[in-house]
UniProtKB/Swiss-Prot annotation:
Disulphide-bridged cysteine pairs: none
Record has rRNA-binding as a keyword: yes
A biological process term (GO) from this entry: translation
Name this protein carries in UniProt: Small ribosomal subunit protein uS17
Length: 82
């Protein structure tokens, strides 16, 4: 196992859950045949202890131990407010 903690940056889609947020992570994938770069989005549930995020915020999250069935990421900081 590596010692580096995975961190990602994404946009908050939803904050309707208590102490939880849904973050959209965008990445670019090259099409195997045509070579065009396509945007692909992954939704991740993250833990927000102080309920400080709103929809549209750009945030940094890091991986942690599983906190629930779907949450294994936690909020590090809010980069920009919506």
């Amino acid at each position: 196992m590596s010692d580096t903690i995975r961190t990602l940056q994404g946009r908050v889609l939803s904050n309707k859950m208590d102490k939880s947020i849904t973050v959209a992570i965008e990445r670019k994938v090259k099409h195997p045949l045509y070579g065009k770069f396509l945007k692909r989005t992954t939704k991740i549930h993250a833990h927000d202890e102080q309920n400080q995020c709103n929809a549209g915020d750009v945030v940094t999250i890091r991986e942690c131990r599983p906190l629930s069935k779907t949450k294994s990421w936690t909020l590090v900081e809010v980069v920009t407010k919506a």
